[in-house]
């Protein structure tokens, strides 16, 4: 059994390709379809904090429309606590387009 977890979006080609690469390399990850089972607020904060530590900016795509809304740039680093309220209270429907992997 692998200790890899993939937060997967089956509609996303990148996520499907990543899952295929994991399988092709003999890994059997735990698969969480985050669109069907979204993490709670606390789970998401812990997950992002565990993966990115103080570099939350690394988990937001440079092209993401949230970058200007949060006054972020790819050079800056942001503490998760400083933006999580905005992300969780964001009014428009944001459709996640990629899965991500947690190893460990």
Swiss-Prot record:
EC number(s) from the headed UniProt entry: 1.20.4.1
InterPro entries, per the entry: Arsenate_reductase-like, Thioredoxin-like_sf
Reaction catalysis annotation: [glutaredoxin]-dithiol + arsenate + glutathione + H(+) = glutathionyl-S-S-[glutaredoxin] + arsenite + H2O
PROSITE patterns: ARSC (PS51353)
Active site, UniProt feature: 12
One annotated GO molecular function: arsenate reductase (glutaredoxin) activity
Keyword hit for Oxidoreductase: yes
Keywords on record: Arsenical resistance, Oxidoreductase
Superkingdom assignment: Bacteria
Enzyme class of the recorded protein, top EC level: oxidoreductase
Cross-referenced Gene3D superfamilies: Glutaredoxin (3.40.30.10)
Miscellaneous comment: Is missing about 40 C-terminal residues compared to paralogs.
Protein name, per record: Putative arsenate reductase
Species, as recorded: Escherichia coli (strain K12)
Gene expressing this chain: yfjU
């Amino acid at each position: 059994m692998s200790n890899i977890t993939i937060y997967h979006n089956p509609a996303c080609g990148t996520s499907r390709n990543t899952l295929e690469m994991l399988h092709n390399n003999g890994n059997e990850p735990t698969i969480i379809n985050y669109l069907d089972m979204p993490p709670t607020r606390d789970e998401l904060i812990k997950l992002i904090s565990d993966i990115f530590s103080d570099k939350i900016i690394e988990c937001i795509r440079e092209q993401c429309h949230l970058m200007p809304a949060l006054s972020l740039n790819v050079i800056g680093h942001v503490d998760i606590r400083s933006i999580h309220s905005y992300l969780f209270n964001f009014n428009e429907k944001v459709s996640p387009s990629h899965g991500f992997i947690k190893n460990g």
